[in-house]
């Protein structure tokens, strides 16, 4: 069905998510110039560089070897589990689902389309079941946060794709936020901290309560907590006067005013903080590449980081105080913001796509 639609549309260029494997392999037979997109940092295994879900820094040799051994072991274990499950039978005998990540299932798609799965994919990298070789990849990250010398020449760092003027239609807390903003503008400047632990995973109520406790000891700060639709403000208990918690916050509006942010290490929050020049305290929940983002934030000097499940309220308070009072954090992220949002950086993606489309 996908191939039929593409034949009718006859596009000049395909932009496909790096994890949309059926679309990548299925469309390969059409000869349409293709680029892949991702929010990830470089996924391939490179000398002296950890996998993107690791807390470790470059050149921690023994630790990096152990990290990559873990990645391979986890991948093999996941493959075995799937093969011995009901889904494993479906992978072998069909039908193939559009979102499958099973290499067994993708082999059947590759056979039908003439795609050489072994030659054109890389199973040694971080992403399951594989990455792709010889295909341009556009990542919405900045090269300055990458570890090592950067990925292969196919990997292009186009920077944050943040709509800074967007209206968050789902933001049920907009009125409460704007009332707080009005009060803030009637008095002398108070540091504003924004906290969001994402909208995909269930909120870590224990961590959020520790954040509230930290703010309660600092009545000279204002704290806004956006729950991303993953929890109710009532779950946090009674809140001090300087804390506002809402089910959905108008994130870009709040970040435009914030002096520091507490985030979980997701790529969207990382890039939005960069776009607005807001130093970060990353309290990683350990999902996907969050630990790796936490390591990059601290390594670049644009924030501090901890494991969200264990960080204490007193540590949160102390680290926020550092972010708010030590100029180096705001200086570093302001400089990174200038690089990330500069016209040459934005034009790179356009130039690349136009060049690819012109190859047809």
What does each model-identified segment do?
Residues 198-199, 224-232:
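Glycosyltransferase donor-sugar binding loop
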Residues 194, 212-227:
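A conserved nucleotide-sugar
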């Amino acid at each position: 069905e996908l191939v039929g639609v593409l034949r009718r549309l006859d596009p000049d260029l395909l932009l496909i998510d790096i994890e949309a494997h059926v679309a990548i392999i299925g469309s390969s037979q059409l000869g349409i110039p293709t680029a892949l997109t991702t929010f990830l940092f470089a996924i391939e295994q490179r000398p002296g560089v950890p996998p993107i879900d690791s807390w470790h820094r470059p050149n921690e040799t023994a630790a990096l070897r152990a990290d990559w051994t873990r990645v391979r072991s986890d991948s093999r274990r996941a493959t075995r589990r799937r093969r011995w499950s009901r889904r494993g039978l479906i992978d072998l005998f069909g039908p193939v689902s559009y979102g499958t990540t099973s290499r067994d299932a993708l082999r059947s798609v590759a056979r039908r389309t003439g795609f050489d799965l072994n030659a054109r994919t890389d199973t040694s990298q971080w992403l399951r079941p594989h990455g792709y070789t010889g295909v341009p990849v556009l990542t919405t990250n900045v090269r300055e946060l990458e570890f090592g010398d950067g990925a292969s020449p196919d990997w292009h760092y186009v920077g944050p794709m943040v709509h800074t003027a967007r209206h968050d239609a789902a933001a049920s807390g907009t009125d409460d936020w704007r009332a707080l903003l009005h009060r803030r503008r009637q008095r002398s400047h108070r540091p504003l901290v924004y906290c969001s632990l994402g909208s995909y995973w269930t909120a870590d109520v224990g961590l959020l309560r520790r954040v509230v406790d930290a703010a309660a000891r600092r009545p000279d700060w204002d704290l806004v907590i956006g729950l991303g639709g993953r929890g109710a403000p009532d779950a946090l208990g009674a809140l001090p006067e300087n804390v506002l918690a809402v089910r959905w916050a108008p994130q870009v509006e709040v970040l435009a005013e914030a002096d520091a942010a507490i985030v979980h290490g997701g790529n969207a929050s990382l890039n939005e903080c960069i776009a607005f020049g807001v130093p970060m305290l990353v309290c990683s929940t350990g999902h996907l590449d969050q630990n790796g983002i936490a390591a990059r934030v601290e390594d670049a000097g644009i924030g501090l980081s901890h494991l969200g499940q264990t960080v204490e309220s007193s540590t949160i308070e102390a680290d926020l105080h550092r972010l708010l009072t030590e100029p180096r954090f705001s200086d570093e992220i302001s400089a990174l913001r200038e690089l990330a949002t500069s016209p040459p950086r934005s034009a790179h993606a356009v130039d690349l796509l136009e060049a690819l489309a012109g190859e047809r």
